[in-house]
């Protein structure tokens, strides 16, 4: 009872067509479709851009990790330094 029925939607549709005309409605539909297409394209480009930035960051982190000495080497250096201090 409180909802909009099929007949009410049909009457609203007829009134809209009479007010705007079919040519304007087609134009509005085309403009709306173009806007949606552009929006989807922009989102896809943004996602592609983000994924390439993530790939660049991953490769940079790998390079940084390659430059850092391993824990074993650090521990060996610390032991050698402490032995040298003990000798001195």
Swiss-Prot record:
It is found in: Cell inner membrane. GO terms for cellular component: TAT protein transport complex. Gene3D superfamilies: 1.20.5.3310. The keyword Transport applies. GO terms for molecular function: protein transmembrane transporter activity. GO terms for biological process: protein transport by the Tat complex. The chain crosses the membrane at residues 1-21. Keywords: Cell inner membrane, Cell membrane, Membrane, Protein transport, Translocation, Transmembrane, Transmembrane helix, Transport. Pfam families: TatA_B_E. It is a single-pass membrane protein. Residues 46-88 are annotated as: Disordered. InterPro entries: TatA/B/E, TatA/E. Part of the twin-arginine translocation (Tat) system that transports large folded proteins containing a characteristic twin-arginine motif in their signal peptide across membranes. TatA could form the protein-conducting channel of the Tat system. PANTHER family: SEC-INDEPENDENT PROTEIN TRANSLOCASE PROTEIN TATA. HAMAP family: TatA_E (MF_00236). Belongs to the TatA/E family. The Tat system comprises two distinct complexes: a TatABC complex, containing multiple copies of TatA, TatB and TatC subunits, and a separate TatA complex, containing only TatA subunits. Substrates initially bind to the TatABC complex, which probably triggers association of the separate TatA complex to form the active translocon. This is Sec-independent protein translocase protein TatA. The gene is tatA.
């Amino acid at each position: 009872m409180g909802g909009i029925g099929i007949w009410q939607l049909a009457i609203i549709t007829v009134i809209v067509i009479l007010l705007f005309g079919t040519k304007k409605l087609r134009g509005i539909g085309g403009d709306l479709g173009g806007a949606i297409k552009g929006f989807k394209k922009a989102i896809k480009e943004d996602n592609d851009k983000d994924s390439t930035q993530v790939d660049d960051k991953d490769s940079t982190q790998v390079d940084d990790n390659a430059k850092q000495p391993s824990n074993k080497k650090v521990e060996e250096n610390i032991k050698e330094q402490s032995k040298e201090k003990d000798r001195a």
